[in-house]
Amino acid sequence: MCYSAQVVEAWEVFVAKTGADISLLDFARLYGMRLLDRSVRIPRAVDAAFARATGDAAQSIRTAIDSFNRQQALTWEQELFTQRRRLADAERALQSRPTKSAAESRRIAGQKIDWLRGKLADLRRSGLVADDSRIFPGWYAPVIVAEQGAKRVMPMRYQCRPAGVPADHDKRFPGTYNARRDKLEGYWRGLFGRSHAVMPVRRFYENVRRGDANVVLEFSPADQQPMLVACLWSRWTGPDGSTLLSFAAITDEPPPEVAATGHDRCVIPIKPEHVDAWLNPDPKNLAACYAILDDRERPYYEHRLAA
């Protein structure tokens, strides 16, 4: 399963080349939600796009991002103060009478202090690094869809919750960030041929076994060209009227170079000339949808151990 991916940096520039418009209203709604719910995870590279955007809607998004960063910094600074005090207390205790409990408290406090310092330094840096574009299940990413005949970029959660299911579906089916091709007319029949999307990514990541250990491999096209990964998406509405936009990346049997690493699935990059047809499927002609998946981009995937 594709458990993680790296979205295209400067994604707003890339998607503009596809003719898609950014749904600022949906992004503004998401960033407002993050202020109230810290579990909402958005890659920093997505935030960065709005530092370059213009207009009132983009300004409201920047304001929400700045507010969130201030809240996050305050939370970490308060926790850093607490851990420094814990470290000082443990060191005083060790000086008077060494105990395993005090030594363990000092060790834990030291680890947390290092982690918090790293997080604060990360929050304050200005440039982007590769990991700023990574998404994981439950994170939000920019996804291209077609609505009312126009391509739009909307932020969606990388774990699909189909319309009509209860909210606890996410816990009962935690693997719904991927949609197996051989299940498209089974589990995914409500979305396949109806609600298609593409996600612009640079590379993807997979868990593989190496002896008794699990390692993460990073796969990227040898030509370093971005991919438009085939996805399914859903607009879920809860009993209280709340809305969730979410998606799953379609996976298929891997090419030989991916299979040789020990992994049995791979994402499907759509050819640019098929994007419009993919985003506007005919539910009565699933054969055409499968034909697009078959006539995919077939780059050679290089791999390395993920950092």
Task: Please annotate each region the language model reported.
Residues M1-A307:
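Short linear sequence motif anchored by a di-proline
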